[in-house]
Curated annotation (Swiss-Prot):
This is Translation initiation factor 2 subunit alpha. Belongs to the eIF-2-alpha family. The keyword RNA-binding applies. Pfam families: EIF_2_alpha, S1. eIF-2 functions in the early steps of protein synthesis by forming a ternary complex with GTP and initiator tRNA. The gene is eif2a. One of its GO terms (molecular function) is ribosome binding.
Length: 254
């Protein structure tokens, strides 16, 4: 869902090439219905471009940077050479996510028995303003526990969250570090095992032996902040047990 009629200078946009000429190419902006773009041959690639068709063809989708906007004609000037591969991959992924979000939004509207334009004005536009993209709003709803977005009201919220949880998979993030554990006691091995035994209800925690005296810990969660909190809690538990059992422990975050 796009709430702007035109992109701004500097924006990255997904362009479908419609016509390739000797000195440039025309295309339509996938995220901006009715808006066309033009890539001059000098903005196709760095260096001299002998054959433009070596770089562009009809039907091809490319990511370009907006370098000029004509609001009256709804035409923008574009540059292909000013976009690197990393930016291009990220933009294509973002665009595909927004396509998915638009389809999910239509499902939300259908369950509410309202048309998409009505829903867009009631809450869609505001969600994009708050989260930056519609997909980000669905991600937020999918991760919610309890009331989601208390600053907004409406019967649409429960349906939106329901659709989000049914269709959005939140990838896990991980944080890690290393414990160095020492004990000179006769039963030191058993003490170290006890120190490094983490309660199962702490979270998704993996502990692996690297080589004496090092152990690697990895904490996984769908929320980075929560993963950090779990890791901090584990370190606290280990330190408390180590002190009680007279085991030396040093922790270094990776």
């Amino acid at each position: 869902m796009n709430i702007k009629p035109l992109p701004d200078n500097g924006d990255l946009v997904v362009v479908k090439i419609t016509e390739v000429k000797n000195f440039g190419a025309n295309g339509v902006l996938e995220e901006y219905p009715g808006v066309e773009g033009y890539i001059h041959i000098s903005e196709v690639a760095t260096g001299w471009v002998k054959h433009i068709r070596s770089y562009l063809r009809e039907g091809q989708r490319v990511v370009c940077k907006v370098i000029g906007v004509n609001p009256e004609r709804k035409v923008v000037d574009l540059s292909l050479k000013r976009v690197n591969q990393h930016q291009s991959r990220e933009k294509i992924a973002e665009w595909k996510n927004e396509q998915k979000a638009d389809k999910l939004f239509e499902i939300v509207c259908s369950r509410l028995n309202r048309n998409p334009e009505e829903c867009k004005e009631q809450f869609g536009r505001r969600l994009v303003e708050l989260f930056g993209t519609l997909f980000a709003a669905f991600e937020s709803a999918a991760q919610s526990n309890g009331e989601w977005l208390p600053e907004m009201n409406g019967d649409w919220k429960n349906v939106f969250v329901e659709i989000a949880k049914e269709n959005i998979t939140i990838p896990e993030v991980s944080v890690s570090g290393y414990f160095e554990v020492y004990s000179l006691a006769s039963d030191g091995v058993e003490r170290i095992k006890e120190v490094l035994t983490i309660p199962e209800d702490t979270g998704k925690v993996e502990l692996e032996y690297v080589g004496a005296p090092r152990y690697r810990i990895v904490v996984k969660d769908k929320d980075y902040k929560k993963a950090e909190e779990i890791l901090k809690k584990v370190v606290q538990i280990v330190n408390e047990k180590a002190k009680k059992l007279q085991v030396e422990v040093e922790f270094n975050k990776q």
